[in-house]
Regions:
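Sec-dependent bacterial lipoprotein signal peptides
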Residues: 1-22
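Acidic glycine-/aspartate-rich tracts in secreted/extracellular proteins
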Residues: 69-74, 94, 131-135
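A low-complexity, Ser/Thr/Gly/Pro-enriched, surface-exposed linker/loop concept
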Residues: 75-107, 144-149
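Short, low-complexity cationic-aromatic patches
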Residues: 41-64, 110-124
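Bacterial lipoprotein signal-peptidase II cleavage site
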Residues: 24-35
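Extracytosolic low-complexity repeat regions of secreted or lipid-anchored proteins
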Residues: 99-150
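Hydrophobic core segments of beta-strands in well-ordered, beta-rich domains
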Residues: 65-68, 127-129
Length: 150
């Protein structure tokens, strides 16, 4: 049994408290803990099915991606009502844009006339189709709209 004098008890409690705070990382915030590192997860990945082969999908929600034959590299020609039917794949400013395994082409972003940054693949803007509501849906293939392929 350890006998602690009246003044020594306060000293021991203070020392134990300091050790506990130090063991828990201290009370001052760490700059690395408060600054999130940018994500390096892919923006676009591939999906394969027997009817369409391998095509691009959004990495977050796995929805099918399309390109518009009336677009030119670096320019979206889909605006207004077109965007209601064919929403653009957009990212926040500064977000990294890259492909997952099996996607070897070049990704970039363009600033749309309405403001957002739209993801491009091989220079062509990428879009969703509003009637694709479930993972694996590929209902947006039309003469002017084609599956985005790696």
């Amino acid at each position: 049994m350890i006998k602690i004098s009246q003044g020594g008890g306060r000293l021991l409690v203070g020392a134990l408290t300091a050790m506990l705070i130090a063991a828990c990382g201290g009370s001052s915030p760490s700059s690395s803990a408060s600054t999130p590192s940018p994500t390096t997860a892919p923006t676009v990945v591939t999906r394969t099915d027997s009817a369409h082969g391998t095509f691009l999908v959004d990495a977050t929600n796995q929805m099918t991606l399309y390109t518009f034959t009336h677009d030119t590299p670096g320019v979206s020609n889909c605006s207004g009502q077109c965007l209601a039917v064919w929403p653009a794949l957009t990212v926040p400013a500064g977000a990294p844009v890259k492909g997952g395994a099996g996607v070897t082409g070049q990704f970039a972003t363009i600033t749309r006339a309405d403001g957002p940054l739209q993801v491009t693949y091989q220079g062509l803007p990428l879009y969703f189709f509003h009637k694709d509501v479930a993972v694996g849906d590929v209902t947006g293939v039309y003469p002017s709209w084609v599956l985005a392929k790696p």
